[in-house]
Amino acid sequence: MCWRGSRPDGRSDVQCYGTQYGRFVRGTIKFYQGDKLTGESDSVFSYDANARLIVYSQWVSNGGVGFGQATLENGEIVFQNRLPGGDEAPARSVWRKVDADSFRVARQRRADDGSWKDEQVVTYSRVAAAPKG
């Protein structure tokens, strides 16, 4: 299944998810500026039964690699990135289901007072697949 989110500046991305080996969730993201493909990312998610949370690894076509965990909080999925040493990164994404065909993603950054503040909010809608780049 794939979802597309667009921003006012013409940037968009298409995120597609499916199962892998009947046990993992595999995600791919294609980033666009207008119709031009500008980057790609892959990720794999698995459930850590001991910690009772989802862990993930992600990598990007520009060479970036990231790790983190996801938890369910008040009906939202909170994706918390981790720094290379394992500490919590000052940024996270919070996903909330809007309806059967869309979800809202708030990219947040920790403020000086310790609270989380939205930096960008994008609503993703279901699409058939990512367009060719």
Show the residue positions of the predicted features.
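Hydrophobic small-molecule pocket/channel-lining residues, especially in calycin-type beta-barrels
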Residues: M1-G133
